[in-house]
């Protein structure tokens, strides 16, 4: 008899919370739906996505530090209470404007390192991005005027012989290769090019 009574009590205990949970779960889901689509979340997502698209249109690359700063701003704004968020919308917009201005300033100062057509490859050759139809003018720094005129230079100009180098002095080709690692790679390639044609050069040298 005790087992039956215990079994009945257990069955009632187990069956009672289930309908309660079923009744509570849709109420919770309905209560959570407006929270997910609440106003403080959506504009932050728009600004972050708009920031990335804005910078990818011009240079096709995004600085990760500025993205982290925007995410921190987003967490600060959404972490506060909704009443505070509704009370101070202008302050949040000022913070966002300041963050965007700061990120763009950082990007302008470091734009020399983010040039998409100067990516050193492993094998020594430089991969160069062809200018797309959307790129009407290439961004350039004032001390590098040849990039504004020509954009990414084709390989035929870079592989020109020494005899034609006088006519290409105005392009400042020596400024394009500033890193010592790149010059070492180019010297290595030149040595191997002469060794491939080796028999002729070996006869001349000996």
From Swiss-Prot:
One of its GO terms (biological process) is negative regulation of cytokine production involved in inflammatory response. The modification N-acetylmethionine is found at residue 1. The keyword Zinc does not apply. GO terms for cellular component: ciliary transition zone; cytoplasm. InterPro entries: UNC119-bd. The modification Phosphoserine is found at residues 25, 140, 167. It is found in: Cytoplasm; Cell projection, Cilium. Keywords: Acetylation, Cell projection, Cilium, Cilium biogenesis/degradation, Cytoplasm, Inflammatory response, Phosphoprotein, Protein transport, Transport. The keyword Protein transport applies. Residues 1-41 are annotated as: Disordered. Belongs to the UNC119-binding protein family. Regulates the macrophage function, by enhancing the resolution of inflammation and wound repair functions mediated by M2 macrophages. The regulation of macrophage function is, due at least in part, to its ability to inhibit glycolysis. May also play a role in trafficking of proteins via its interaction with UNC119 and UNC119B cargo adapters: may help the release of UNC119 and UNC119B cargo or the recycling of UNC119 and UNC119B. May play a role in ciliary membrane localization via its interaction with UNC119B and protein transport into photoreceptor cells. Interacts with UNC119 and UNC119B; interaction preferentially takes place when UNC119 and UNC119B are unliganded with myristoylated proteins. This is Macrophage immunometabolism regulator. The lineage of its organism: Eukaryota, Metazoa, Chordata, Craniata, Vertebrata.
